């Protein structure tokens, strides 16, 4: 009820704050009470998304297994990346994560609960892009403008990690990396095709694909 105090006593509120403080510090990178929460915090800092925090705070509550926590962290990260690279709006994400936090607060905190949440919300403002939609977004959207700065660097680093074999040396992302977009957006005038005809890349013309 609006206006009703959430806690009967100040002591109760302080206990909740004390419980969540280490998790918050882990998300902010100043402490590490769990490796998966620390990993998620690093990703959220790169993507500058703090609206996930109410959800992340619940991933260490009693009853959440380590496997479920790890998968939930990966799913949250995947959700952010997929939406960004598909060109979907981010303005409603605060409401989305508030709703997820409410689902986890009143029910099981599991990957299945998260899957059911998104299955019931296929709209553009909240949908979890499918593999097919994500692939289309990667192939048709300018990722370097949709995920600028640290975001595209983070995506490329994850691709680098995924391409390594299990024998590759593990290590954190170097701090001095940067991304250079060396291909021009409009290049036909300076580098014309041999036949002189200009075909738009996403026009559907098979000759554009062949080139």
Residues covered by each model-derived region:
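Alpha-helix capping/termination and helix-coil
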Residues: 60, 80, 163, 183-191
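Histidine-centered nuclease catalytic patch
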Residues: 170-211
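A cross-family structural signal marking well-folded subdomains
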Residues: 1-158
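A general structural signal for short secondary-structure junctions and capping/turn motifs
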Residues: 2, 6-7, 44-47, 167-174, ...
């Amino acid at each position: 009820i609006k206006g009703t105090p959430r806690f009967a006593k100040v002591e109760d509120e302080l206990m909740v704050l004390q419980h969540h403080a280490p998790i918050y510090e882990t998300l902010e990178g100043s402490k590490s009470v769990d490796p998966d929460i620390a990993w998620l915090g690093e990703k959220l800092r790169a993507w500058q998304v703090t609206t996930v925090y109410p959800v992340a705070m619940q991933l260490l509550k009693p009853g959440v297994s380590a496997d479920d926590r790890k998968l939930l962290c990966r799913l949250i990260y995947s959700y952010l990346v997929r939406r960004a690279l598909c060109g979907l709006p981010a303005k409603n994400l605060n409401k989305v994560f508030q709703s997820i936090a409410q689902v986890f607060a009143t029910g099981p905190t599991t990957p299945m609960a998260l899957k059911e949440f998104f299955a019931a919300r296929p709209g553009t403002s909240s949908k979890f892009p499918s593999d097919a939609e994500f692939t289309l977004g990667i192939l048709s959207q300018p990722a370097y403008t949709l995920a600028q700065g640290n975001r595209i660097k983070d995506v490329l680093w994850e691709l680098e990690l995924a391409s390594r074999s299990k024998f590759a040396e593990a290590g954190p992302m170097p701090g001095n990396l940067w991304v250079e977009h060396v291909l021009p957006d409009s290049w036909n005038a300076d580098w014309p095709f041999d036949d002189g005809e200009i075909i738009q890349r996403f026009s559907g013309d098979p000759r554009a694909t062949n080139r």
